[in-house]
Design a protein with these regions (language model features):
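Active-site-adjacent loop/tail segments of enzyme domains
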Residues: 48, 73-103, 130-136
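Short arginine-rich
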Residues: 63, 98-105, 151
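Anionic-ligand binding region
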Residues: 92-96, 108-128
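Active-site oxyanion/phosphate-handling segment shared across diverse enzymes
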Residues: 121-206, 213
Length: 214
């Protein structure tokens, strides 16, 4: 995609970088300069994660030119946020909690134009169905994959490589996940189906001033 302005990814996530690369989007990285990443009080979780992505983009745009892209992902079970595990024992406890259950993955992004100081924020929700897991399944997974840097202690790309992701993909029968409702890329860390139209629209005409959040 040929953008009229350089795209700056304000995220250290290797998964988000992979998604952009897989979809032919050129970018460079800038540091995320938002140091307080707590969700704003009083907002529903989906609104809260959009607000957080917005705050990340605005903070990270300091001294930067072009388009700043930020994102944040929440793994939510029974309205409780599962963050990144602090230890392998913590990871095992998270996967045990997810076993046989359905949880939601909410990812929001904000694309911020540093020239007009305006931006667009979008979010998506994917429902993830976990199989009933035996203790051996959990132990095998946490010792075979890097789980400490992933919210909820799992990565969908470990279960189904992104090169195979499509509408009709088949998840292996022995995988942790039985099926998903919604976007694979959203679970991986960036709802690319929502981002692409925003980028394409931006290349055709300048965004109107004012922050849009829907």
């Amino acid at each position: 995609m040929d953008l009229s302005l350089p795209l700056r990814l304000a995220s250290a996530s290797p998964r988000r970088a992979e998604i952009l690369t897989q979809h032919g989007i050129l970018f460079s990285r800038v540091p995320n300069l938002l140091y307080d990443e707590t969700l704003s009080e009083g907002l529903p979780l989906r609104s809260g994660v959009r607000d957080l992505a917005y705050r990340k983009a605005v903070a990270s745009a300091a001294g930067v030119s072009g388009l700043v892209l930020s994102a944040d992902t929440l793994v939510v079970l029974d309205n409780h946020i599962l963050g990144k595990p602090k230890s392998l024992d913590d990871a095992a406890a998270m996967l045990t909690a997810l076993s046989g259950r359905v949880h939601e993955v909410m990812t929001a992004f904000c694309l911020w134009d540093t020239r007009s100081r305006s931006g667009v924020a979008r979010s998506a929700v994917t429902k993830v169905h976990f199989r009933k897991l035996a203790s051996r399944d959990i132990l095998d997974y946490i010792h075979c994959f890097h789980v400490l840097d992933k919210a909820g202690a799992y990565g969908i790309q470990d279960i189904l490589p992104y090169s195979q992701a499509s509408r009709d993909f088949v998840i292996p029968k022995n995988a942790l996940i039985s099926h998903i409702e919604g976007s694979y890329w959203n679970v991986m860390g960036l709802p690319i189906a929502l981002l692409l139209p925003v980028l394409k629209k931006y290349t055709r005409s300048k965004m109107k001033p004012g922050f849009q959040i829907v």
